[in-house]
């Protein structure tokens, strides 16, 4: 989320840190023995955690901080278990861009200065447009994900040189599976380029933009929803008019941050016969990144074809 939303990512209280300090060296020793053969990795979300597992396979021990598909990541509350995992991590993968600032703060408070930290937004090279805000949901941008995979491979190889070749091979295989996803986006662009769509949040915008689609949602609407603020009546009516007036072909709906105003958008779209494509910010249970993104792109293509 934009930097301002990091205020809603609750940090550890001093009491929690005191509790962590009392965890004891015996627990640390037991954990070290159980994972000594694996590289300890912490990912801010299960999206990045799954990518790490795809590359590290059985040579990594991955902790994903945010993994509940029913939870709004914007309001996540970090805890002492997260702090403990980050204090021991050799490799850390975060999204960056204000989405998960708690990771850097917890690394600092846990005095872990040696971890290799991969910041996906920095890897992407993306910046905020002039007069606008950065869309930090870079895991919906497949070229960025490919670069992140390379960084993960390199970090794991540094931590475990004996398995470097396997990490590189796995990263290459993972990136090869991204190519069909980009081809699907190119096909959508060829068949539906210029089509207007609506969103509830900027989450899917890298996917829709790569597919040649035009977002018609008032910026004030999606920004307010992303910030957890109320949408003004005027902006809400402008958004709803997109559906009643048949001005968009699809609504892409973030299920993880739904509320009364986004539900009104969903209801208006359905009432107008406009397809709704649900998306999430974290992996649904039982899915992996590649399967999840394949389903997202396929759902978008199917909706546009109706």
Show the residue positions of the predicted features:
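Extracytoplasmic metal-acquisition and chelation regions
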Residues: 2-14, 19-306
């Amino acid at each position: 989320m934009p930097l301002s939303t990091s205020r809603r990512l609750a940090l550890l209280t001093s009491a929690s840190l005191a509790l962590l300090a009392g965890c004891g060296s015996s627990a640390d020793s037991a954990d070290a023995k159980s994972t000594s053969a694996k590289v300890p990795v912490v990912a801010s979300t299960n999206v990045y955690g799954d990518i790490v597992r795809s590359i590290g396979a059985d040579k990594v021990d991955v902790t994903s901080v945010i993994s509940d598909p029913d939870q709004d990541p914007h309001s996540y509350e970090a805890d002492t278990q997260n702090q403990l995992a980050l204090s021991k991590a050799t490799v850390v993968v975060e999204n960056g861009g204000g989405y998960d600032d708690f990771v850097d703060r917890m690394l600092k408070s846990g005095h872990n200065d040696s971890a290799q930290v991969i910041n996906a937004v920095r890897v992407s090279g993306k910046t905020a447009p002039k007069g606008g805000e950065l869309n930090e949901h870079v895991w919906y941008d497949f070229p960025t994900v490919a670069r992140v995979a390379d960084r993960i491979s390199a970090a794991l190889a540094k931590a475990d040189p004996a398995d470097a070749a396997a990490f590189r091979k796995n990263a290459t295989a993972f990136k090869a599976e991204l190519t069909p996803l980009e081809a699907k986006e190119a096909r959508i662009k060829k068949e539906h380029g210029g089509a207007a769509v609506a969103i509830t949040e900027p989450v899917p915008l890298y996917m829709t933009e790569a597919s040649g689609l035009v977002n018609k949602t008032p910026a004030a609407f999606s920004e307010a929803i992303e910030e957890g603020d109320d949408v003004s009546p005027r902006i809400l009516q402008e958004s709803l008019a997109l559906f009643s007036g048949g001005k968009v072909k699809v609504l892409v709906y973030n299920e993880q941050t739904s509320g009364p105003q986004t539900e009104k958008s969903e209801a208006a779209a359905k009432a107008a016969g406009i397809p709704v494509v649900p998306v999430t910010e974290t992996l649904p249970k039982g899915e992996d990144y590649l399967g999840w993104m394949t389903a997202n792109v396929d759902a978008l293509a199917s909706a546009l074809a109706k």
